[in-house]
Amino acid sequence: MPQYKLTYFDIRGLGEGARLIFHQAGVKFEDNRLKREDWPALKPKTPFGQLPLLEVDGEVLAQSAAIYRYLGRQFGLAGKTPMEEAQVDSIFDQFKDFMAELRPCFRVLAGFEEGDKEKVLKEVAVPARDKHLPLLEKFLAKSGSEYMVGKSVTWADLVITDSLASWESLIPDFLSGHLQLKKYIEHVRELPNIKKWIAERPKTPY
């Protein structure tokens, strides 16, 4: 079995998807949580000056989505056929667009930037939500299961549900009117390995 080391800050953020994949697969890994003050020294040594980083027997992989895809395929959480794998990638690429549109709102709500919270909710969060959540619901309905693609959980389900749950904790009515997505999130978070990790993981604001 390869030796895995995941390096990210002591928050959920872009590192949590990989942690969830490891826990769902039941694969041991080193969860290296970097202190903010240690980041400037490490940053120039990373491929793109960003975290997370995954080390596999010492070989480094950067970029969160690349890490998710690699781990998903390694652990059988990427779809059962080439077409399912491609559909998983497609849905997650759309979800990344959604998260990119929400980023200005997150930076204000989380206190990284000053701004009018009500304004960013109205002008950024609500339009992005109303544009993208129906697309996710469409894929969920098309699958005919409790997952976005196929009949079993994929890495994209793990990342998407955790991100949406985080947004719902930040904006309580974020999923209002989207009962199907709420049930989807609840189902994935009740998977035994995921439920155990959520109960045990360090409590962080995001």
From Swiss-Prot:
Gene3D superfamilies: 1.20.1050.10, Glutaredoxin. Residues 2-79 form the GST N-terminal domain. Residues 81-206 form the GST C-terminal domain. GO terms for molecular function: glutathione peroxidase activity; glutathione transferase activity. Keywords: Transferase. Its EC number is 2.5.1.18. The keyword Transferase applies. InterPro entries: Glutathione-S-Trfase_C-like, Glutathione-S-Trfase_C_sf, Glutathione_S-Trfase_N, GST_C, GST_superfamily, Thioredoxin-like_sf. One of its GO terms (biological process) is glutathione metabolic process. Glutathione binds at Y8, W39, K43, G49, Q50, L51, Q63, S64. The keyword Nucleus does not apply. GO terms for cellular component: brush border; cytoplasm. It catalyses: RX + glutathione = an S-substituted glutathione + a halide anion + H(+). PANTHER family: GLUTATHIONE S-TRANSFERASE (PTHR11571), HEMATOPOIETIC PROSTAGLANDIN D SYNTHASE (PTHR11571:SF224). Conjugation of reduced glutathione to a wide number of exogenous and endogenous hydrophobic electrophiles. Can also function as a GSH peroxidase. Belongs to the GST superfamily. Sigma family. This is Glutathione S-transferase 1. The lineage of its organism: Eukaryota, Metazoa, Ecdysozoa, Nematoda, Chromadorea.
